[in-house]
Amino acid sequence: MAKKDVIELEGTVSEALPNAMFKVKLENGHEILCHISGKLRMNFIRILEGDKVNVELSPYDLTRGRITWRKK
């Protein structure tokens, strides 16, 4: 998938699930299932409930996403 096709949104982590999966509540009220991007995983960035994150969504499946950035 090309980088230009992704949808970038902001949200808050509402629940931490096994296997580095998270439920993220988006600003528009939807709740999606997300995994951590490779850069965050390689640099051991910890993501906890309540953290503000940037999420990338594919236009083909709007129920799953990738966490690309954790805000302070």
UniProtKB/Swiss-Prot annotation:
Keywords: Cytoplasm, Initiation factor, Protein biosynthesis, RNA-binding, rRNA-binding. Residues 1-72 form the S1-like domain. The gene is infA. Pfam families: eIF-1a. GO terms for molecular function: ribosome binding; rRNA binding; translation initiation factor activity. Transmembrane segments: none annotated. Gene3D superfamilies: Nucleic acid-binding proteins (2.40.50.140). Belongs to the IF-1 family. Component of the 30S ribosomal translation pre-initiation complex which assembles on the 30S ribosome in the order IF-2 and IF-3, IF-1 and N-formylmethionyl-tRNA(fMet); mRNA recruitment can occur at any time during PIC assembly. Its main location: cytoplasm. InterPro entries: NA-bd_OB-fold, RNA-binding_domain_S1_IF1, S1_domain, TIF_IF1. It is found in: Cytoplasm. This is Translation initiation factor IF-1. One of the essential components for the initiation of protein synthesis. Stabilizes the binding of IF-2 and IF-3 on the 30S subunit to which N-formylmethionyl-tRNA(fMet) subsequently binds. Helps modulate mRNA selection, yielding the 30S pre-initiation complex (PIC). Upon addition of the 50S ribosomal subunit IF-1, IF-2 and IF-3 are released leaving the mature 70S translation initiation complex. PROSITE patterns: S1_IF1_TYPE (PS50832). GO terms for cellular component: cytosol.
